[in-house]
């Protein structure tokens, strides 16, 4: 199947799914349809392990959106589809390049659209295809367009067809056609220019032989002076961090407990400080081990201090993790506290990868290439799991459970709240939840969100 055929097919699918509908089950179906067509179209040589994993995650993301219909599942579909399209074109390019290439494709869309010779067939079309265009598609387009114009200009003309109860919103049809074509064109006509392969060279995970030659970074510092600056800096920072860890843990676990508001403020400030410290720590390692120091036999002290610096930062993260856990036990779960866990876990992963970078003599790009997949994994986990339900189930066990807060601010908590209402005999809460659920369940099939159908 050619690109232009896929563009027309998926544009028609988009219009069919979204005409007269709001976003819901239809978007999940669209995502799965794109994934299946991509699998069908992609040449066997590009169907490697990464491509097949991305195919599965794209389908699962589509299912997640059909189930929840929220922003994070939309983001999961968006990122998964871009990566799938990218890997269907090249198996060797780093996935980190997918987003920049996608943005370039969006910007250059007007130019690429008018390059008809690149995406429309230049040879003579088959007889059947010509008949389809000449007898069906072109006449149908003009009939629909002029029918809408004449109906708007004459009530009597429109009334001729009222017995058929035929309603047609031309502008919605036209807008959906344009949007569907824009999406389909940029997906199927996904172009990777030559300069991208130059970027890919800069994102290599391993050093080339010429990168291993010992040379100073700056002209005003020779190699010995630069090495010494690294040793002094990292030694001083290790001492400073060790003192900070001691005071940090004393303030968190030894001092007299404070009021909830004060404790909340201090906890968030400390976690922010930890995250910033981790970013700076990784930045320090990247700065000193960006090149020849990875292969400098005289840089053993520098490497030991760097690894010590990484280990101490892991200890700092674990301290913050324990404090956040204590905070959750004392005051319950929220989205923000779950977010803190996510950031701290990503921080530990980043530090472990930094340790591997130093130990295995990897490039700085190695860190970014690997962390990209972990961030993508976090998006997938956030989209697949009902975190609102987990938060509500956890907090329901508390004596100070705030029903209204979870009713308004925590998403997808209705099933847990119905259980709570049943246990407490709260008929008012039960009726409110069911009334809201019934209004959502009344939507047309393609506009439904599957989760709403489970609320009974």
Regions found by a protein language model. Name each.
Residues 15-155, 176-198:
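Transmembrane-helix bundle segments that line or gate the permeation/cavity pathway
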Residues 407-456:
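Extracytosolic and intramembrane catalytic regions of membrane-associated proteins
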Residues 308-357:
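Membrane-embedded alpha-helical segments of integral membrane proteins
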Residues 364-388:
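Internal/C-terminal transmembrane anchor helices
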Residues 1-3, 44-50, 116-129, 159, ...:
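Juxtamembrane membrane-water interface segments of multi-pass membrane proteins
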Residues 163-176, 260-277, 334-344:
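Short aromatic-rich membrane-water interface segments that cap or initiate transmembrane helices
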Residues 380-404:
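Hydrophobic alpha-helical transmembrane segments in integral membrane proteins
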Residues 145-160, 243-258, 318-325, 391-392:
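Membrane-helix interface motif
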């Amino acid at each position: 199947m050619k690109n232009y055929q896929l563009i027309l097919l998926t544009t028609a699918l988009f219009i069919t799914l979204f005409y007269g509908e709001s976003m819901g089950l239809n978007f999940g179906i669209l995502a799965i349809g794109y994934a299946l067509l991509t699998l069908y179209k992609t040449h066997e040589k590009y169907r490697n392990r990464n491509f097949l994993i991305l195919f599965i995650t794209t389908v699962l993301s589509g299912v997640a959106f059909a189930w929840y219909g929220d922003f994070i599942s939309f983001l999961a579909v968006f990122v998964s589809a871009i990566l799938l399209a990218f890997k269907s074109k090249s198996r060797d390019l780093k996935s980190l390049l997918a987003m920049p290439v996608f943005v370039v494709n969006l910007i250059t869309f007007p130019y690429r659209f008018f390059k008809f010779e690149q995406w429309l067939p230049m040879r003579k079309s088959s007889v059947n295809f010509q008949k389809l265009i000449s007898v069906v598609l072109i006449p149908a387009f003009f009939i629909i367009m002029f029918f809408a114009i004449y109906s708007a200009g004459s009530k009597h003309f429109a009334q001729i067809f009222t017995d058929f109860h035929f309603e047609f919103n031309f502008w919605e049809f036209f807008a959906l056609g344009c949007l569907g074509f824009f999406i389909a064109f940029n997906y199927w006509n996904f172009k990777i220019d030559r300069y991208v392969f130059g970027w890919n060279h800069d994102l290599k995970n391993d050093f080339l032989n010429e990168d291993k030659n010992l040379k100073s970074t700056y002209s005003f510092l020779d190699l010995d002076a630069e090495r010494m600056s690294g040793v002094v800096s990292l030694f001083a920072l290790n001492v400073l961090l060790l003192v900070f860890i001691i005071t940090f843990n004393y303030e968190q676990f030894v001092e007299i407990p404070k009021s909830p508001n004060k404790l909340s403020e201090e906890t968030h400030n400390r976690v922010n400080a930890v995250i910033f410290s981790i970013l700076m720590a990784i930045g320090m390692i990247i700065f000193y081990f960006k090149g020849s120091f990875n292969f400098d036999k005289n840089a053993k002290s520098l490497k030991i201090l760097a690894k010590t610096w990484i280990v101490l930062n892991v200890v700092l993260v674990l301290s913050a993790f324990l404090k956040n856990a204590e905070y959750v036990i004392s005051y319950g779960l929220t989205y923000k506290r779950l977010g803190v866990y996510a950031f701290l876990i990503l921080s530990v992963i980043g530090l472990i990868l930094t340790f591997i970078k130093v130990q295995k003599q990897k490039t700085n790009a190695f860190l970014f290439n690997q962390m990209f997949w972990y961030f993508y994994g976090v998006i997938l986990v956030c989209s697949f799991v009902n975190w609102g339900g987990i938060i509500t189930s956890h907090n329901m066990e508390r004596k100070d459970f705030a029903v209204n807060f979870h009713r308004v601010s925590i998403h997808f908590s209705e099933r847990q709240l119905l259980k709570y209402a049943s246990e407490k005999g709260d008929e008012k809460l039960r009726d409110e939840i069911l009334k809201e659920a019934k209004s959502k369940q009344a939507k047309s099939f393609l506009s439904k969100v599957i989760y709403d159908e489970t609320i009974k």
